[in-house]
Design a protein with these regions (language model features):
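Topology signature of small-to-medium multi-pass alpha-helical membrane proteins
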Residues: 1-165
């Protein structure tokens, strides 16, 4: 992978956007991880939940922390170290993967609600906002993945594949 000529302004904008995403992921991940740790190990079965985030997803919080740290790896891009674009690409890939998993869970909840409706239960849209995930489609990792799409577009546009001689 070679990097085409990238202006200093573009590099700084990409770095600032990546840092903003990284900080958001770190905030969401640390809250989810801390509340899940509290509910799992300190106050067993406790219902602690901060800012409406799920309080029982320890591994989702850890994944969000990792994604935030990967996005923060793009900080050297501010000084023109264009090799840091890889952190943006990997962070966006991890972000999209986590969002896809959560969207599949929401879809499975919808399928469950539909099958229950077919068997005679009353239809409810609750699966969309309060399903297995606790927050359903309002899960912050889903929306943060959508926020990372402009960044990955610019990063992919500024890179191209080339053959090594």
């Amino acid at each position: 992978m070679t990097v085409t000529k990238l202006s200093e302004r573009s590099g700084r904008c990409m770095a600032a956007y990546a840092v903003a995403l990284g900080v958001l992921y770190l905030m969401v991940g640390s809250i989810e991880f801390a509340t899940a740790f509290w509910n799992w190990f300190i106050e067993l079965g406790g219902g602690l939940s901060l800012l409406g985030l799920p309080g029982d997803d320890l591994f989702g919080g850890f994944a969000a922390l990792v994604i935030g740290l990967v996005f923060l790896g793009a900080i050297p891009l501010w000084k023109g170290s264009y090799e840091s674009i890889g952190f943006i690409l990997i962070g966006s890939l991890l972000s999209a993967t986590l969002a896809a998993v959560y969207l599949l869970i929401v879809g499975a909840d919808g399928l469950t609600a539909w099958l229950a409706h077919l068997s005679g239960e009353e239809w409810s849209w609750e699966w969309l906002t309060a399903g297995t995930l606790g927050t359903g489609i309002f899960r912050p990792e889903i929306w943060l993945a959508f926020l990372s799409t402009p960044l990955v577009y610019i990063a992919l546009k500024s890179t191209r594949t080339g053959r090594q001689a």
